[in-house]
Amino acid sequence: MLGKARELANYQDEPEQLPTGSFGKNAFLRLGFERRPERTVLATLHRRAPLIVQQALYWDEGMPTLPCVSIISNAGGILQGDRYAIEIDLEPDTQAHVTTQSATRIQEMDANFATQTQTITLGANSYLEYIPHPIIPHKHSRFVQQTEVTIHPTATLIYSEVLMAGRKYYGTGELFHYDLFSSKFHAAHTDGTSLFTEKFIVEPARGNVSRLGAMGSFHVFGNLILLTPKTHADRLFETIDPVFDMDEGIAWGASRLPNDAGLLFKVLGMESAPVRAAIRKIWEAARQEVTGASLPENFLWA
């Protein structure tokens, strides 16, 4: 059970408001994609507020048959005691793009914590881009996320997350004022073979996040996980050169994942825009390599 994670031991008190996981605080979303003769469709949609999806749209000019889904929240952010669950299922030979409507704000907390579980399943020759907007943890927030991926060896997943240091320009600034941010990602093949696990726990009060070897002088952390067949990963890896440019306030690098699972790309920056641009560059290259399709120009408001 995610709420029993060791890093949450000090945050088991109940909120004075709505109880943990009660109505309005136990969001659920299930997206099931299936192949039709002309395109992939969002065939299954189960939702429980505050997570909302209305329908799939086909706005991607580079891949006109790609269903694009935006996850919306009507809660104004993630609150203490919230328990979110997201399931994404791609049948064989399907393609999908999933994102969020805007940044995910983890609101200030004085009791308990919030969790989100993500379960992603990709069938043979399927392709998923899961590119949410940044996560902004507010002062004293506590958030734990666990992502479980089951992927066929012929499928591809482009998964990203961008973690802000907090509300950088709020008042005098909130840089690393949150209590806890924990994220675990585990991937396995459909036959049950475990590929790798990555977990990072950030507790600013317990250690200097700005030290060398952690964030250093940077304020934004970007993480892109590319699960794809080895031939794709090998070609992409050769095109990614490491960068460390303090004048521009950006640094990135790529490494290979264990068991020929794919690539891991990490980027640090001072602001979210350059970090997201670096992730978009790898996303674009991966899409071109795997599907042969181009990425459309970014929206002006993105």
UniProtKB/Swiss-Prot annotation:
PANTHER family: UREASE ACCESSORY PROTEIN D (PTHR33643:SF1). The keyword Chaperone applies. Required for maturation of urease via the functional incorporation of the urease nickel metallocenter. Keywords: Chaperone, Cytoplasm, Nickel insertion. It is found in: Cytoplasm. GO terms for molecular function: nickel cation binding. HAMAP family: UreD. It comes from the Bacteria. Pfam families: UreD. InterPro entries: UreD (IPR002669). GO terms for cellular component: cytoplasm. UreD, UreF and UreG form a complex that acts as a GTP-hydrolysis-dependent molecular chaperone, activating the urease apoprotein by helping to assemble the nickel containing metallocenter of UreC. The UreE protein probably delivers the nickel. This is Urease accessory protein UreD 2. Belongs to the UreD family.
